[in-house]
Design a protein with these regions (language model features):
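Conserved N-terminal entry element of GNAT/NAT acetyltransferase domains
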Residues: 1-17
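Core beta-strand residues in small-molecule sensory/regulatory alpha/beta domains
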Residues: 39-43
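Conserved acetyl-CoA-binding loop-helix of GNAT-fold acetyltransferases
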Residues: 79-85, 91-107, 133
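C-terminal "cap" of GNAT-fold acetyltransferases
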Residues: 145-189
């Protein structure tokens, strides 16, 4: 028995069950700029057991200290980060259901968004399969990431391949909203 909710406030009681006070303090600007977190709640215990952060704006360079990679988002794009499900619930299709909840959240609160970028480490086969097979995502770009401490992240300069896309200085190579890196424009997906 689960329910899902979109959270726009770092003081939400369910979000506080999953995140440290330090991270919630760091992420106040994330929420102020329109970001949200989609939470999975186990109803019998009223406990948060899954989360998915949705970045809806292009972060500033100083946001690296908040754990936000420097992604260049167009007006019709967002970035899915920090998808996590408690190990006790991973076999119950909670992450799959959250994909549909993401769609419902975007339809309701962000109708202008057309594309959702995700992120998975190359060696994280489970996340990559989830993104490709269930969410219908495909690889558009590879980067090398550097992490310092608990939160600070950045992209190793020059590691973006190909040189156009969300992690490149110029963002995606097409401004019309229909053509995405890694896919033909024919509509065959």
């Amino acid at each position: 028995d689960f329910r899902f909710k979109c959270v726009f406030d770092p003081t939400d009681r369910h979000l506080r069950q999953l995140e440290t006070p330090e991270r919630l303090e760091l992420m106040k600007p994330f929420f102020a700029h329109g970001g949200c977190v989609i939470l999975g709640i186990h109803e019998p215990t009223d406990t948060a057991m899954a989360k998915m952060w949705l970045l809806t704006y292009t972060p500033k360079p100083s946001d690296a200290k908040r754990g936000l990679l420097p992604i260049d988002l167009a007006k019709d794009e967002c970035f899915l980060l920090d998808l996590w499900t408690h190990p006790d619930y991973r076999r119950q299709a909670v992450a799959f259901t959250m994909a549909y909840e993401l769609g419902a959240c975007v339809d309701r609160f962000y109708p202008q968004l057309r594309w959702v970028y995700g992120y998975a480490h190359k060696d994280n086969e489970a996340s990559r399969n989830l993104m490709e097979l269930i969410y219908g995502m495909w690889a558009v770009q590879e980067i090398k990431e550097v992490e310092i401490g608990d939160f600070w992240v950045n992209v190793v300069p020059g590691s973006d391949t190909p040189k156009f896309g969300p992690f490149s200085k110029k963002g995606r190579h097409s401004g019309d909203g229909f053509q995405m890196p890694g896919r033909p424009r024919s509509g065959d997906m």
